[in-house]
């Protein structure tokens, strides 16, 4: 048999369409309702871990200044009315309070991990304070 030269042919785009199953056809023929896209959601815990990393890197104060100032003034009212505070004094109080809370939460987290949990509970805070000698 003699060899013949083959000429290039235009392709028609792959495989021939197959018949769809009844369930697929029913799904495709159903009307699309508005095309509203669901908002993206991260897996549980992903955002929490991202926030932990972000706050551990940062050095700024985490409690808002004005609400903290109102709280300090409200507590000070119980001891003496008409007390005045320098802004630097309230700033120093806020630094001390935040440092205390961060270290308390670190100890609380260790107590929860010791109990084979990842969620901190009230009893973890109580145990951490008791071990520190703050509360009997």
UniProtKB/Swiss-Prot annotation:
User: Where, subcellularly, is it found?
Assistant: Nucleus; Chromosome
* In-chain residues carrying the UniProt-annotated modification N6-methyllysine: 5, 10, 19, 24, 28, 37, 80
What is a single Pfam family found in this protein's UniProt entry? Answer: Histone
Return one GO MF term. Answer: protein heterodimerization activity
Q: What does this protein do?
A: Core component of nucleosome. Nucleosomes wrap and compact DNA into chromatin, limiting DNA accessibility to the cellular machineries which require DNA as a template. Histones thereby play a central role in transcription regulation, DNA repair, DNA replication and chromosomal stability. DNA accessibility is regulated via a complex set of post-translational modifications of histones, also called histone code, and nucleosome remodeling.
SMART domains (alphabetical): H3 (SM00428)
Q: Which Gene3D superfamilies match?
A: Histone, subunit A (1.10.20.10)
Q: Note whether Phosphoprotein occurs among the keywords.
A: yes
SUBUNIT field: The nucleosome is a histone octamer containing two molecules each of H2A, H2B, H3 and H4 assembled in one H3-H4 heterotetramer and two H2A-H2B heterodimers. The octamer wraps approximately 147 bp of DNA.
- In the record, Phosphoserine modifications are located at 11
Kindly list the positions at which N6,N6,N6-trimethyllysine occurs in this protein.
Answer: 5, 28, 37, 80
**PTM-bearing positions, type N6-acetyllysine:** 10, 15, 19, 24, 28, 37, 57, 65
The answer to keyword Metal-binding applying to this record is: no
Family statement: Belongs to the histone H3 family.
Chain positions found as N6,N6-dimethyllysine = 5, 15, 28, 37, 80
* Gene Ontology cellular component terms for the protein in this record: nucleosome; nucleus
Its PTM note reads:
Phosphorylated to form H3S10ph. H3S10ph promotes subsequent H3K14ac formation and is required for transcriptional activation through TBP recruitment to the promoters. Mono-, di- and trimethylated by the COMPASS complex to form H3K4me1/2/3. H3K4me activates gene expression by regulating transcription elongation and plays a role in telomere length maintenance. H3K4me enrichment correlates with transcription levels, and occurs in a 5' to 3' gradient with H3K4me3 enrichment at the 5'-end of genes, shifting to H3K4me2 and then H3K4me1. Methylated by SET2 to form H3K36me. H3K36me represses gene expression. Methylated by DOT1 to form H3K79me. H3K79me is required for association of SIR proteins with telomeric regions and for telomeric silencing.
Span list, region Disordered? 1-41
Record's protein name: Histone H3.3
Q: What keywords sit in the KW lines?
A: Acetylation, Chromosome, DNA-binding, Methylation, Nucleosome core, Nucleus, Phosphoprotein
């Amino acid at each position: 048999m003699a060899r013949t030269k083959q000429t290039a042919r235009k392709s028609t785009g792959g495989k021939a369409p197959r018949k769809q199953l009844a369930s697929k056809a029913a799904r495709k023929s159903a009307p699309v309702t508005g095309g509203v896209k669901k908002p993206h959601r991260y897996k549980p815990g992903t955002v929490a871990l991202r926030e932990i990393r972000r706050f551990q890197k940062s050095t700024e104060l985490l409690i808002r200044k004005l609400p903290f100032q109102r709280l300090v003034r409200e507590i000070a009212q119980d001891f003496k009315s008409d007390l005045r505070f320098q802004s630097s004094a309230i700033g120093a109080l806020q630094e001390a309070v935040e440092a205390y809370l961060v270290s308390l939460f670190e100890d609380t987290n260790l107590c929860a991990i010791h109990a084979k949990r990842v969620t901190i509970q009230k009893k973890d805070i109580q145990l951490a304070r008791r071990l520190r000698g703050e509360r009997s």
